[in-house]
Amino acid sequence: MRPLSKYTKPIPAGSLFGLITIYGMIPLTEQLYAFQIVIILNIATLRQSDTVYLLDSSIYIFQAWFGYPDYFHDASGRSVNAVYGYAKTLFSQLRTLNPVYLLAAFDESLFSGFRHELYPDYKANRALPDEELAHQLYLCRRLTELSGVHCVGDSVYEADDWLALGAKVAAAGGLKTAVITRDKDLAQLVRPGDLWWDWAAGKQRDYQALREHWTVLPEEIPDLLALMGDSSDNIPGIAGIGEKSSKALLQHFGNLENLYGDLDSVLGLEMRGVRRLYNALQDTEEEAFLFRELIRLHPPPQHLTLQDMSLEPVSSDRILDFFDQEGLGAAFRNLVTQHYA
């Protein structure tokens, strides 16, 4: 059979019937073969373009920061282990996903966000990045931008909030989302058809799997964590209410409004220690709702479109030039060469 390239010309991306206009140029015996090729190529495109990928970039930078040895340095001797590890992960994600839409969010609001105004002890158990790590965070964001990915983050809203905005835009456009993260807080974004994806662990959970894992609906996770607490964000929860009790309460009441609106009903639950739970919940309504407000995601009041989240054309030479300008050596150049081979 003769190669189809003899008969074809460039076809608009995503056009299922792009070859129809030139079918008259193709022998009848080859038309079916050509049409099958077009269908296969376009189904592959549709698999990618019906999903907006939301990348929690900061979590993978810190994962590389802690996970890679202090072996990689720039020309001035500064450590760049986090940049190397993050670059490997980013290139792997881009190669595997081949996304049409991808939004990368970065945390830039530690100790300056609106949540600290609501609750000064929020994330008080964390430290600001030192100068060396701050430089690596900058390099990682710049690399992501040069890789054609739309990047977001500011000093008021957390990365999670920006990803919530991306999910909102995706839903308005009738698209699914896949949240790439290890952060349990982001599971609250998942709706039927979406995914929560722990990339490093190779673990994907859809809406039902998250519901089974947490025993509450994904959108109820803020209510759950408000009761049981979240030590990673220095949110204490309600004293005397642990994870098991919190899940049992939410399975019955569904949310904080129903729980505190009918608190006397706790005494009638068929579970151990209901009197203790009832006493622990007394006069804690304001606390619980505050904690939920901290855990809930708040999309920034900014304009974002699907077009903004479209992956842009990439020049590997620009990335190589960036590595050269920042004094990053052969190991980094090899990553680019392998990725764009």
Predicted regions: what they are:
Residues 7, 17, 23, 33-35:
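Aromatic (phenylalanine/tyrosine) cluster motif
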Residues 43-49, 100-103, 149, 193, ...:
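Non-catalytic nucleic-acid-binding/docking modules located in mid-to-C-terminal regions
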Residues 2-5:
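Low-acidity, Ser/Thr- and Arg-rich intrinsically disordered low-complexity segments
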